Swiss-Prot record:
Stated role: Involved in chemotaxis. Part of a chemotaxis signal transduction system that modulates chemotaxis in response to various stimuli. Catalyzes the demethylation of specific methylglutamate residues introduced into the chemoreceptors (methyl-accepting chemotaxis proteins or MCP) by CheR. Also mediates the irreversible deamidation of specific glutamine residues to glutamic acid.
Active site: S166, H192, D289
GO MF: phosphorelay response regulator activity; protein-glutamate methylesterase activity; protein-glutamine glutaminase activity
Lineage, top ranks: Bacteria, Pseudomonadati, Pseudomonadota, Gammaproteobacteria, Vibrionales
Cleavable signal peptide: none
Gene: cheB2
Parts forming coiled coils: none
Protein name as it appears in the record: Protein-glutamate methylesterase/protein-glutamine glutaminase 2
Statement: the UniProt record of this protein carries the keyword Lipid biosynthesis: no
UniProt EC number: 3.1.1.61, 3.5.1.44
Disulfide bonds listed in the record: none
Organism: Vibrio vulnificus (strain YJ016)
């Protein structure tokens, strides 16, 4: 027997894009467009009448922009939302704000570049919408951790923390980092994100954390304590040791698990270069990127921890890590900062 289709409401002011997106979504046997609204006011009435499972929402719209509408929606009628973004600096800031307000995910409007790969674009859009329909909306919001305290970090046996995340991760990473003290070993972060968004993402983290956070932009950087480094959205971040010093370098080889940057690539390099002197953390996200790399870390003697199902927006990557035996510990997001600090002291 066929299961019930997930009901999608499309909100976009362009009639051409509404038609294209509706056609893409309806091509998926699990999804069905039950309506298309041209502005937030029309969307509000349609949400009440049609009760969609998931909403796609354009960031740039007349009358009221998508972010403002999302803010009202999350307060009055929380439901899974996937933002449709432009790959611009302004689009990046607005999208990250939308994710902070509770949107599950985003995808870019098709450009000339990605129309060439319309099949790939189609499957990306539908996968994100299917995932969002099953996401736990507000999982991050309810899990704000207390600021953790730590002592004697400089003498810890653990010389590096590696964090991997995908859907829901921009907020989970922020919650985790903003609750960590300023004194920490170097932290490397691979978050699945568009290249245009990784810089603004790092800047937002930097503004909300005691640690110094930056996007890795040069080919090779010596890793420093009390600093966190974010992989750019189009290159793998790898860690290696030269002499007594740890370095991160950017790798332009093909995508792994369909992702670039890939968490598996980062974790694998950490396993090789630090053996048991690292901590691996896998947070919310769809798919299974990071599970095999985390298993390598565990086999080399590192400590590994996965975010628990209840606090994940999407329990995909952590589930894969748990199921393959890679995760030694499973913790809710709000307990992770203190757990890391306890390990370090």
């Amino acid at each position: 027997m066929m299961s019930k289709k997930m009901k999608v409401l499309v909100v976009d002011d362009s009639p051409v894009f509404r038609a294209l997106l509706s056609e893409i979504i309806n091509s998926d046997p699990q999804l069905e467009v039950i309506g298309a609204a041209e502005d937030p006011y029309q969307a509000r009435e349609m949400i009440k009448a049609l009760k969609p499972d998931v909403l796609t929402l354009d960031i740039e719209m007349p009358k009221m922009n998508g972010v403002q509408f999302l803010k009202n929606l999350m307060r009055l009628h929380p439901l899974p939302v996937v933002m449709i973004s432009t790959l611009t600096q302004h689009g990046a800031d607005a999208t990250l704000m939308a994710l902070e307000l509770g949107a599950v995910d985003y995808f870019p409007k098709p450009s000339v570049a990605n129309t060439a790969d319309m099949l790939g674009y189609r499957s990306l859009v539908n996968e994100k919408i299917r995932m969002a329909a099953q996401a736990q909306v507000g999982a991050n919001q309810s899990m704000s951790p207390a600021v953790a305290s730590s002592s004697a970090v400089s003498t810890s046996q653990y010389q590096l923390i590696a964090i991997g995340a995908s859907t829901g991760g921009t907020e989970a990473v922020k919650h985790l980092l903003s609750a960590l003290p300023a004194s920490m070993p170097p932290i490397v972060i691979t978050q699945h994100i568009s290249a245009m968004f990784s810089g603004p993402f790092a800047s937002r983290l930097d503004a909300s954390c005691a640690l110094s956070v930056s996007e890795l932009t040069q080919g090779e950087v010596a890793l420093k304590a009390n600093h966190a480094y974010v992989a750019p959205g189009d290159k793998h971040l790898m860690v290696f040791r030269r002499g007594g010093q740890l370095y991160a370098h950017l790798d332009d080889s093909p995508a792994v698990n369909r992702h670039k940057p890939s968490v598996d690539v980062m974790f694998g390099s950490v396993a090789e270069s630090l053996k048991g002197k690292a901590i691996g953390v896998i947070l919310t996200g769809m798919g299974k990127d990071g599970a095999q790399g985390m298993l390598q870390m565990k086999q080399q003697g590192a400590i590994t921890v996965a975010q628990d199902e209840q606090s994940c927006v999407v329990y995909g990557m952590p589930r894969a890590a748990v199921e393959c035996g890679a995760a030694m510990h499973i913790k809710p997001l709000n307990k992770l900062p203190q757990f890391l600090c306890d390990l370090l002291s």
